[in-house]
Curated annotation (Swiss-Prot):
Residues 1-73, 156-197, 213-248 are annotated as: Disordered. ATP binds at residues 274-282, 297. It catalyses: L-seryl-[protein] + ATP = O-phospho-L-seryl-[protein] + ADP + H(+); L-threonyl-[protein] + ATP = O-phospho-L-threonyl-[protein] + ADP + H(+). It comes from the Eukaryota. The lineage of its organism: Eukaryota, Metazoa, Chordata, Craniata, Vertebrata. This is Serine/threonine-protein kinase PAK 3.
Amino acid sequence: MSDSLDNEEKPPAPPLRMNSNNRDSSALNHSSKPLPMAPEEKNKKARLRSIFPGGGDKTNKKKEKERPEISLPSDFEHTIHVGFDAVTGEFTGIPEQWARLLQTSNITKLEQKKNPQAVLDVLKFYDSKETVNNQKYMSFTSGDKSAHGYIAAHQSNTKTASEPPLAPPVSEEEDEEEEEEEDDNEPPPVIAPRPEHTKSIYTRSVVESIASPAAPNKEATPPSAENANSSTLYRNTDRQRKKSKMTDEEILEKLRSIVSVGDPKKKYTRFEKIGQGASGTVYTALDIATGQEVAIKQMNLQQQPKKELIINEILVMRENKNPNIVNYLDSYLVGDELWVVMEYLAGGSLTDVVTETCMDEGQIAAVCRECLQALDFLHSNQVIHRDIKSDNILLGMDGSVKLTDFGFCAQITPEQSKRSTMVGTPYWMAPEVVTRKAYGPKVDIWSLGIMAIEMVEGEPPYLNENPLRALYLIATNGTPELQNPERLSAVFRDFLNRCLEMDVDRRGSAKELLQHPFLKLAKPLSSLTPLILAAKEAIKNSSR
């Protein structure tokens, strides 16, 4: 009798997506042909030795040592002039590498003719040398879904079949030579749950930009193709500057001034490994004094590709504590490792929920409200997150919603109220970022709007497009179209339009959108718990 009563009281299970969007990335194919990689310096030397033998002679070796070292050229400028012939519909003076990218981009000739400048903008982005093999600080890969969000799924050496030609492949010979230089004990990276082409892209050091604010690029807009048959549309300047990078010792000295003194093993107990990456490990642990469960990232500093970002991320997290942000708790230097202690949210990332379950408008409104509260706090403290997406939203089992991953965040100052670096994740990028214009905090609002579409449709717009064409569509299409707009309420559609307004001045701010009528539909955060449980169960079943 009691069993039948219990069954009657249980709420119906939340709806699951018929086709999980959390699919293996190998299912996607953008027909992106990889570009050949420029030969590395050591390979050039090997070829020279084969042409000029005698390197094995001791006398020659001695002479080689005596030769003065000639440094690489600096402050040189390589200018590319690309034009567009409106009659033939072809670009003129386009580099071969760009031509190859364009051929595999699926951007039609009509689209190229319609907006050649947008095509060149996205080509410039892909050609940016600093996008190759860059990796965010504190990013790991793991097959453990509970670690998702703490173990970011955008590690640059995690390759999948559908990866776009951001990082050209290396030959087997070059690959072997690189592997010899790396630690043989490094575990192989696990394939990330999201397609590799949704990974975050980093093209300029945030620390460098903060330390010495530079004025936005005021390069004049080239004449349009309509005004001349063959106009110079684009100038690409490639400079190699002497950068004032911090030395490893300077970084360690700065970290020592930030971290706590003492042995973390005396403060935390019951360490349980939840993730492993090439540069470190993530554990859960208990604070002995409070009993609080925490996440601890243990990173080998020697294996961190951008050590300068460590200081940036820790300082931003430490100085910006908020109920809607995954809060930094503490950090320690233990030998060659940096241990960063953060809040632990056992619910996993929002990505698991959006890809495995169907959210209703009340639940979506609740998530949007919590995210806007986090963004309002950050923006009021002159911080732009720059990588808002479901992967960077963590959930507690009680339904709490918190923003994480400050590897790309930027501090803005009165002297530098706009930024012009290309960072973020392509499918969530605001148009002004794609077209490399100066931008402000409202780039986070656009990304939030794209994330709201994720919650409706299970994935961001253009995810199945070639990444280069997706960037073109973001730059030219304006507000992306919904698959089934008629299924959404008028108030929700208006909220999306306010977030995804092309005109930045008309786009809502976090403070303004917190007053939007759509947020009045928000259900209690506890309504997210059944979705979290259903997503965990679906993922567990799919892995069997």
